[in-house]
Amino acid sequence: GFKNCYVGIMQMQYDGIQFYFIDNEYYFSGPKPYDSAPWDLEKFAFFSKAVLSVLPVIGFRPDIIHCHDWQTGLVPVYLHDSFQENEFFRGIKTVMTIHNLKFQGVWDVKTVKDITGLSDYYFAPDKLEAYKDANFLKGGMVFADAITTVSNTYAEEIKTEFYGEKLD
């Protein structure tokens, strides 16, 4: 299952806006933001869980968490799975924005189960499973309260078989 890890919170105020950053040397000290699966899957599973975990610590309860692409696809899943029992998280909504449907965060179910700590319940065709693999983006789309794309044109394109990347 998912291991306990240090989550640092860095904050900065700029032009009257408070920014928070998730810190973890193990996951975020590499030379590039994207590497290769399954390393990226583990890193972004950590990030998704960390985002939710820090909210009560910093005393910020958002109305909406806006997720972008597969890298944050587990935020709506984790919110549904392990955070809804906590009153703090009840009623928080999620929006999943798709920038590029080609990149979905796909890997075998066993590895993703080990990385995420999610139960068998989540690995079904109507949830994270797609063509017998686990799919972070699909999970985010299934569990998000709303789905958006970067444009109306892109929204129409990805509804077609060619651009639907097997999620049509």
Regions found by a protein language model. Give the residues of each.
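Catalytic cores of nucleotide-sugar-dependent glycosyltransferases that transfer UDP/GDP/TDP-activated
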Residues: 1-168
